[in-house]
């Protein structure tokens, strides 16, 4: 039987992230064969993952990253079961590493099939489920491109956002972060009026009609009044029309124009735990 040293255990722990006792047990069972020990730990992860597949994974880390020239950004959520795990330094580090890798892919399916230190992202999640003892999954994957893309991560990694702009300009870094912070705080449903789907608009009109009828407004006037109330709905719920959180005297669109008269927000992405 092979002699298992502390250095061997530490090496396996570095490779897999598993606990000391789990690593020692795996090495003993594999008679010092590292590849077999790693495989056994992954099989353990598969068993744990199968047993926890129906668990809720609403905690974790929401991470937004951009590439070196700020033209592409990705926001992901790496979800787990408890806040205790979600705030763990190694868990957050893994989420950031995965987010940076995600910049190279266009969708979640491609990303999950990609290589992460010798195994796929999907298999890494299963492996770490066995290590941590909680269900892990990539819940959100959103990509955004633009002439300039900025990011913001809210305290505690609970919300992460990206914003895209039509051009680069002096002060764009701060503006991009401020608008991304706006998207995190105010949770708009769309960039502008054109981005709000027809079903949502129809629903809001019906809500307004019901309120007007309750107020006793004449039926002949209700349709036009209800449509008129959409302006307030768009102002509250679309990013560029919202009051800017740092100066409510102007809209987000006007704040952006104060940076550069020709600058506009072209898109945003928002991911939140829960």
Swiss-Prot record:
The keyword Oxidoreductase appears for this protein:
no
Region named Involved in Mg(2+) ion dislocation from EF-Tu:
82-85
A single GO CC term, please?
A: cytoplasm
Which keywords does the record carry?
A: Cytoplasm, Elongation factor, Protein biosynthesis
Claim: Thylakoid is one of the keywords in the record: no
One GO term in the molecular function aspect is: translation elongation factor activity
Q: Which Pfam families match?
A: EF_TS
Task: Kindly list the places in or outside the cell where this protein is found, as annotated in its UniProt entry.
Answer: Cytoplasm
Coiled-coil positions: none
**Role summary:** Associates with the EF-Tu.GDP complex and induces the exchange of GDP to GTP. It remains bound to the aminoacyl-tRNA.EF-Tu.GTP complex up to the GTP hydrolysis stage on the ribosome.
Instruction: Give the family this protein belongs to, as stated in its UniProt record.
Output: Belongs to the EF-Ts family.
Record-linked PANTHER family:
ELONGATION FACTOR TS, ELONGATION FACTOR TS, MITOCHONDRIAL
* Name of the protein in its database record: Elongation factor Ts
Q: Which gene encodes it?
A: tsf
